[in-house]
């Protein structure tokens, strides 16, 4: 989270109107960035998430991970009223308003679901576009089986607190 927040701070400092976020493990195909930016601009939304689950094509991750993703999808729907099919996706495009929010406040651990709840609770708009993701090319997931229970509890609590706390303070 800290490195991502530093990127958003750099974007604020240099006057960027848009920021693209990708994971560094080779999963995200850059060919979808143009479409995501187009949706951001045409639909006038604040953030676009690349979702591997809208069309269920390409790499889908492990069964256990998909169960966790499904749990977070349902929790986001309960907390915000909006369905987000791939809440753990790190492939995102943000507008200037979101860049400024993330530059000020960005979770350090497993931030994607929490930031979605914070944005939606604060009145920002989020859309998804279908993308194809590749299997991880480099490194290993930071979420091992032994850490998965801790991860689920920590992220669930962070999402609940984001909702109760009212999201980002405008």
Where would I find each of the regions flagged by the language model?
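Acceptor/aglycone-binding surface of glycosyltransferases and processive sugar-polymer synthases
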Residues: 1-14, 18, 30-109, 136-157, ...
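Short, hydrophobic alpha-helix immediately C-terminal to the catalytic nucleophile
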Residues: 5, 116-117
């Amino acid at each position: 989270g800290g490195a991502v927040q530093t990127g958003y701070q750099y974007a604020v400092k240099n006057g960027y109107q848009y920021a693209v976020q990708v994971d560094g493990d080779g999963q995200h195909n850059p060919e979808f960035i143009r479409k995501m930016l187009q949706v951001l601009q045409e639909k006038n939304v604040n953030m676009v998430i690349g979702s591997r689950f809208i069309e269920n094509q390409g790499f889908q991750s492990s069964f256990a991970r998909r169960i966790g993703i499904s749990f977070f999808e349902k929790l986001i729907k309960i907390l915000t009223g909006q369905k987000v099919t791939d809440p753990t996706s790190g492939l995102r495009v943000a507008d200037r308003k979101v860049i400024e929010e993330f530059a000020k406040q960005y979770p350090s651990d497993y931030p994607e679901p929490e930031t979605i709840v914070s944005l939606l609770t604060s009145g920002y708009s989020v859309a998804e576009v279908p993308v194809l993701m590749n299997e991880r090319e480099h490194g290993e997931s930071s979420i091992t089986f032994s850490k998965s229970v801790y991860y689920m509890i920590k992220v669930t609590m962070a999402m609940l607190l984001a909702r109760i706390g009212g999201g980002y303070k405008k």
